[in-house]
């Protein structure tokens, strides 16, 4: 049975403690740098592609870099982020927790989702650095304690939006890509080379992962299937399917939407940043 942190969507910030049960606290190679992958997004709902992206990134890191993955986290955007199809954070955290329940290394951190206000991606990554590298002191290695590299994990549309003028504040891009970096999974229809051409100063800290098996599942398509009363089984984890059906999520009536009219309220930008860049991750 996988270690668990008992994360539930009805937690409050007063109840919050950082989930670390599945974070590996020691690596055996003195030459490797511990890596923690962070996926920030809507996850409305989480799909098998979201989970698969973590596995692809871990393989890429093992075969192509000096990093060694010691943990990975899903961080759901909070309810202050208004978007079509976004159900309450409580539901999204619960679905993510169900999706990773049997994993030995994937975790859900509800910290971002528990905030009433919108949090920029940079603040979320700072939170992980504080908890893992400052409060916990990194991880043990044969060469002594090392800080973990905290890196963003996302689809290629993230880099595309970062290279599009007016979507992100240049200061946010600089802060994220200089201090953390990103593991980016290629997606059909995204010209990754064109997107990277405007981010040349940061390319040493951007790791592009090729999808060897093309997977086009998206949260948007899952919601569409639900509205059309079509099956979503084998596109999302079975416990998530059951949860969606039990709570009548993504039905035609738009149950549990964070938007009062069911149409969203725009992209809910934080100062200088559009969370729309990563919110569907992908979908």
Which sequence ranges carry the predicted segments?
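Nucleotidyltransferase catalytic core that binds NTPs
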Residues: 1-283
């Amino acid at each position: 049975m996988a270690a668990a942190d008992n994360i539930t969507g009805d937690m409050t910030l007063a109840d919050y403690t950082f989930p670390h049960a599945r974070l590996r606290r020691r690596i055996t190679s003195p030459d490797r740098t511990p890596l923690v992958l962070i996926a920030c997004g809507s996850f409305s709902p989480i799909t098998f592609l979201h989970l698969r992206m973590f596995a692809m990134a871990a393989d890429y890191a093992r075969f192509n870099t000096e990093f060694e993955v010691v943990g990975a986290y899903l961080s759901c955007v909070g309810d202050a982020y208004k978007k079509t199809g976004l159900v309450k954070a409580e539901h999204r955290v619960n679905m993510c927790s169900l999706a990773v329940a049997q994993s030995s290394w994937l975790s859900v951190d509800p910290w971002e989702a528990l905030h009433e206000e919108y949090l920029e991606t940079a603040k979320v990554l700072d939170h992980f650095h504080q908890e893992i590298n400052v409060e916990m002191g990194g991880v043990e290695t044969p060469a002594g304690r090392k800080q973990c590299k905290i890196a963003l994990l996302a689809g290629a549309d993230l880099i595309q939006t970062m290279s599009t003028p007016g979507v992100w504040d240049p200061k946010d891009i600089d802060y994220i890509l200089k201090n953390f970096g990103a593991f980016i999974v290629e997606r059909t229809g995204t010209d990754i080379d064109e997107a990277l051409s405007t981010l040349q100063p940061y390319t040493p800290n951007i790791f592009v992962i090729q999808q060897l098996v093309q997977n086009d599942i998206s949260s948007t398509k899952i919601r569409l299937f639900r509205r059309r009363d079509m099956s979503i089984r084998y596109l999302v984890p079975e416990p998530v399917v059951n949860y969606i059906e039990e709570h009548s999520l993504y039905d035609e009536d738009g149950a549990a939407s964070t938007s009062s009219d069911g149409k969203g309220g725009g992209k809910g930008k934080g100062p200088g940043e559009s969370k729309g860049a990563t919110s569907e991750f992908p979908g």
